[in-house]
C-alpha cells in the first residue's frame, strides 16, 4: 500500500452550488434550452408559465410560521402557506436567472430571501410544525444555495440569511430528529424524518458546517439500531425477491401500506436526499447495494398499475398495516426524472416503472410548486426534475462509474465510514477509498486538494473541519467521486448556548470561577430555543 502524506493544499469545503443542483447541472440546462433541445426546452417553457415566476410577486414574510395552529400549543391560525409559496418563488426565479441570465429574477429571489431572514423569528404549532421545519427549511436553503454567488446579494445579507437558517431552522429539525417529541422510534412515518434530514443536510452545505452535515446524514445512513423511518434500512424495510425489480428485488417502503400519497412523497424526498448527497460526492443511491432503487421501483410499479406485487404486513408502535394502502394510488411526485437519469443514464440500470411514472406526466415533463394544487402537498417538493436532471442517453451501458466507499483511521481506531465527527484537533488521519470486491484497481486516483497525491490512501493532519474528495477512473474511462467529511472536535456552530454557574445564592456566566473549599457549586449550560422561546437548563 502506498501512502501520500500532507497537511493539504488549497483547502476546500462543500461544493457550491451543491444541493439539488450543481453548476454543471445549471450549465447543461442553460445550453440545452438555448439550443432548443427537448425535453429541456419544453420543460423550461413550462417553468415560465408558473405563477411563481413573476417579477410582480410580493414576499409575505411573517414573524412566526404556524403549522398546526388553533391548538393548545399554538392559538394563532395556520399561515405556513406563505412560507412555501415564497420559497417556491425564490427557487423558481433563481432557476430562471441561471438559465436566462435575466438579473431581474435574481433580484426577485434575493429580495424574498432577505425579507424572510429579516422578519421570521420562529416556527410554531403542534407536532405538525416539525413538517414545516423540514419541508420549508430545505426549500429556502436550496433557493439560497442557487443565489449564493450572485454579485447582487450583499455579503452581509447572505451572512444574515445563513444565521437565520441556523437559528430558526437547524435547531428545529435536529430537535425533532433527536427527540421525536418524546415518542417511540417508529411512531413517525418516514416523511417526517426524511424532510428533516434533508433540511439539516442542506443547512450544513449552505453554511459549510461539516458537523451539521454529518449529523444529518447519520440518520439516513447508519441508524439501523433505531426504527427511524428515514433510516435507509427501515425506509426500504423489506426486500422481496422478484425478477421484475432491480437486481432481482422489489423493496417494500415504510409508507407503502399506509397510502400512496405518502409513499410517493417519501420516494421524492428520498430521491432529493440521494441527489444532494451525490452532488457532494456522497453517493446515497448506492448505499447498501442500491437498496433505495428497489423501493423506488416498488412504489412506482404499484402507482403505474401493477397489482400483483409482493407485500408483507407492516407493524409499528401504533399498529399493524396488513396490506398495500391503495389510497391516492397513481400519485406522481416531481422527482422521477432524477431517479430515471441517475440509474439509466449514469449507472446503466433500467428502472422501467420509474420511467413509466415519468412518462405519465404531460409530455413526460414534471413541474413543481404552483402546478400541483394550492395546498401543502403541491409544495412538498421543489420539483422540475425533467428540466434540471435530464441527461443525454447512455449509449454504452458498460461505461458506468465504479461504486466507491471509504474508511478512516486515527489514533489506533479504524472506522468503516468516510464521515466522522469530533476527531481530535491535530490528529493524523488516514483516508482510504475502497473499490468493490473483484474490481481491478487502475491506479487512476486524483484528490481535489492535492494533485500530487495519486493513490487511494493518504495521511492528513486534521487541523480544522473540512471535506476531501478523491476521484477514481475505472477501466472504461468513467470517473466517480468519494467524499470524506471530517469534523474537528469543538468546531462548528454553537447555537444559543450560555454557560452558567450558581454559587452561594448568586448566578453568573463566567467560565473562570474562584471557589472556596466545600462551597456548593452548580454549573451547566442554558439553551435558549428561538423556535419556541423555551429555556432548557442542563446542570452538571
Regions flagged by a language model, labelled:
Residues 1-12:
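Bacterial Sec-dependent N-terminal signal peptides
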Residues 426-436, 520-527:
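A short beta-strand segment in extracellular, disulfide-stabilized domains
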Residues 531-540:
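Residue-level detector of conserved catalytic or cofactor/ligand-binding positions
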Residues 480-488:
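C-terminal edge beta-strand
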Residues 437-445, 533:
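Solvent-exposed loop segments of extracellular immunoglobulin-like
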Residues 11-181, 194, 198, 221, ...:
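Extracellular glycan-targeting catalytic surfaces
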Residues 456-468:
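Solvent-exposed segments in extracellular or luminal domains encompassing
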Amino acid at each position: 500500500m502506498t501512502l501520500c502524506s500532507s497537511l493539504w493544499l488549497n483547502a476546500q469545503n462543500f461544493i457550491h452550488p451543491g444541493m439539488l443542483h450543481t453548476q454543471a447541472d445549471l450549465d447543461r440546462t442553460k445550453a440545452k434550452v438555448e439550443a432548443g433541445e427537448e425535453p429541456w426546452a419544453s420543460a423550461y417553457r413550462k417553468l415560465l408559465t408558473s405563477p411563481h415566476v413573476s417579477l410582480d410577486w410580493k414576499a409575505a414574510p411573517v414573524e412566526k410560521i404556524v403549522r398546526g395552529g388553533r391548538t393548545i400549543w399554538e392559538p394563532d391560525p395556520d399561515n405556513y402557506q406563505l412560507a412555501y409559496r415564497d420559497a417556491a418563488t425564490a427557487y423558481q426565479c433563481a432557476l430562471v436567472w441561471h438559465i436566462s441570465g435575466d438579473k431581474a429574477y435574481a433580484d426577485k429571489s434575493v429580495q424574498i430571501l432577505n425579507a424572510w431572514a429579516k422578519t421570521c423569528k420562529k416556527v410554531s404549532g403542534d407536532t405538525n410544525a416539525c413538517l414545516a421545519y423540514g419541508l420549508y427549511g430545505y426549500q429556502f436553503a436550496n433557493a439560497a444555495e442557487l443565489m449564493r454567488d450572485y454579485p447582487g446579494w450583499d455579503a452581509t445579507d447572505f451572512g444574515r440569511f445563513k444565521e437565520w437558517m441556523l437559528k430558526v431552522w437547524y435547531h428545529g429539525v435536529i430537535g425533532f430528529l433527536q427527540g421525536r417529541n418524546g415518542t417511540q422510534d417508529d411512531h413517525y412515518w418516514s416523511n417526517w424524518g426524511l424532510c428533516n434530514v434533508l433540511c439539516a443536510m442542506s443547512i450544513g452545505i449552505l453554511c459549510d458546517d461539516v458537523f451539521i452535515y454529518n449529523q444529518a446524514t447519520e440518520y439516513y445512513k447508519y441508524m439501523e439500531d433505531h426504527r427511524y423511518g428515514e433510516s435507509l434500512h427501515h425506509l426500504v424495510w423489506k426486500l422481496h425477491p422478484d425478477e421484475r425489480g432491480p437486481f432481482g428485488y422489489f423493496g417494500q417502503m415504510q409508507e407503502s401500506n399506509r397510502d400512496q400519497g405518502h409513499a410517493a412523497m417519501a420516494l421524492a424526498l428520498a430521491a432529493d436526499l440521494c441527489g444532494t448527497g451525490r452532488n457532494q460526492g456522497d453517493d446515497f443511491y448506492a448505499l447498501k447495494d442500491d437498496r433505495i432503487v428497489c423501493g423506488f421501483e416498488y412504489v412506482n410499479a404499484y402507482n403505474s398499475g401493477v397489482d400483483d406485487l409482493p407485500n408483507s404486513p407492516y407493524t409499528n408502535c401504533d399498529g399493524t398495516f396488513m396490506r398495500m394502502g391503495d389510497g391516492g394510488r397513481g400519485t406522481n411526485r416531481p422527482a422521477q426524472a432524477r431517479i430515471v437519469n441517475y440509474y439509466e443514464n449514469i449507472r446503466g440500470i433500467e428502472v422501467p416503472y420509474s420511467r413509466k411514472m415519468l412518462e405519465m406526466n404531460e409530455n413526460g415533463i414534471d413541474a413543481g410548486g404552483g402546478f400541483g394544487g394550492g395546498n401543502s402537498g403541491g409544495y412538498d417538493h421543489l420539483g422540475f426534475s425533467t428540466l434540471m436532471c435530464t441527461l443525454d442517453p447512455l449509449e454504452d451501458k458498460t461505461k458506468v462509474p465504479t461504486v466507491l466507499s471509504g474508511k478512516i483511521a486515527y489514533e489506533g481506531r479504524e472506522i468503516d465510514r468516510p464521515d466522522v465527527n469530533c476527531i481530535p484537533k491535530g490528529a493524523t488521519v488516514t483516508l482510504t477509498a475502497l473499490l468493490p470486491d473483484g474490481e481491478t484497481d487502475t491506479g487512476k486516483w486524483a484528490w481535489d486538494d492535492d494533485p500530487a497525491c495519486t493513490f487511494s490512501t493518504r495521511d492528513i493532519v486534521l487541523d480544522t473541519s473540512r471535506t476531501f474528495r478523491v476521484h477514481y477512473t475505472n477501466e472504461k474511462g468513467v470517473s466517480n467521486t468519494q467524499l470524506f467529511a471530517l469534523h474537528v472536535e469543538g468546531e462548528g456552530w454553537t447555537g444559543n448556548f450560555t454557560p452558567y454557574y450558581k454559587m452561594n445564592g448568586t448566578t453568573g456566566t463566567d467560565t473562570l470561577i474562584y471557589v472556596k473549599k466545600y462551597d456548593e457549586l452548580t454549573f451547566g449550560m442554558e439553551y435558549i430555543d428561538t423556535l419556541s422561546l423555551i429555556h432548557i437548563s442542563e446542570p452538571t
